[in-house]
């Protein structure tokens, strides 16, 4: 049996480090992963995958990645259950074994600065075209 997950996506929120009562570091984040195909209206849809990152890896993720960071994740699927209000609930998440940042800090800063830019500013008039 083999349980391996490899994903590329963007963090949907700033990761926050939590320390458990046993002094272990952990962060739980969500990764937005585009589907390989477009919907009927021509738009890409995304799945939002829960990640759990432990220890030094969690500390590194919190230090170097932020909301919108493009990362590659290598891990495994885990299902856990918990009781709430007399009901058993199941949660499936990815336990992260490693990750890689796929954009530099400069690229991230440029993306964040351009996020609010109006597309009208990017349209060139016909006289401005070089050909």
Model-derived segments and spans:
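Beta-rich strand-turn-strand
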Residues: 54-89, 102
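OB-fold and OB-like beta-barrel modules that bind single-stranded nucleic acids
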Residues: 9-13, 31, 67-78, 96-99
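Short histidine
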Residues: 29, 79-81, 124
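Acidic, gly/ser/pro-rich intrinsically disordered tails
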Residues: 1-2, 19-22, 42-44, 87, ...
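Core FKBP-type peptidyl-prolyl cis-trans isomerase
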Residues: 4-46, 90
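Short coil/turn motifs at secondary-structure junctions
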Residues: 14-16, 34-38, 56, 80-82, ...
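Residue-level recognition of specific faces of alpha-helices
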Residues: 4, 28-30, 50, 60, ...
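Beta-strand/loop nucleic-acid-binding surfaces
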Residues: 47-55
């Amino acid at each position: 049996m083999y349980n391996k997950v490899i994903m590329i996506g963007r963090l949907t929120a700033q990761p926050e480090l939590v320390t458990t009562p046993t002094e272990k570091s952990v962060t739980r984040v969500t990764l937005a992963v585009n589907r390989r195909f477009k919907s009927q209206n021509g738009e890409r849809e995304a799945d939002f995958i829960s990640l759990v990152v432990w220890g030094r890896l969690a500390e590194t993720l919190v230090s170097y990645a932020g909301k919108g960071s493009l990362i590659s994740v290598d891990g495994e699927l885990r299902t856990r259950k918990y009781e709430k209000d007399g009901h058993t609930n199941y949660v499936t998440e990815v336990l992260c074994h490693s990750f890689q940042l796929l954009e530099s800090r400069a690229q991230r800063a440029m993306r964040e600065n351009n996020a609010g830019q109006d597309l009208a500013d990017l349209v060139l008039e016909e006289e401005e075209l070089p050909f």
